[in-house]
Amino acid sequence: MQIGDKVPEVLGVDQEGREWRMSDFSGRKVILYFYPKDSTPGCTAEACSLRDHFGELQALGYDILGVSADSAESHQKFAAAQSLPFPLIADTDKRLIEAMGVWGEKNRYGRITVGLLRTTFLIDEQGCV
């Protein structure tokens, strides 16, 4: 995904079972962040930082969506435990993750693995990166 590219229309289903589309955010800016795993230290810190600045970001016109390959049930527990005020998309088939180019090789302490690459996109009012 490059600057200026359009984000796919269908984003996926969140922890409450709601299906999200880019058209739901027409005319709004979106922080679309991808994270590897619910309830892990780094992912929890990232989500809580966005939670802690949620009001400020909304005042600037941003909506927030988190995405990982975890299940909706896992997202529901994570969102409840951390009091997250934004949707978490359960991309279990990795359709959005792969379309956005955030699945690939990563080096973890000298060991090459394949997984979700922690990435954040700022999406403009027209649905472009």
Placement of each model-derived feature along the sequence:
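Chalcogenol-based redox active-site neighborhoods
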Residues: 1-129
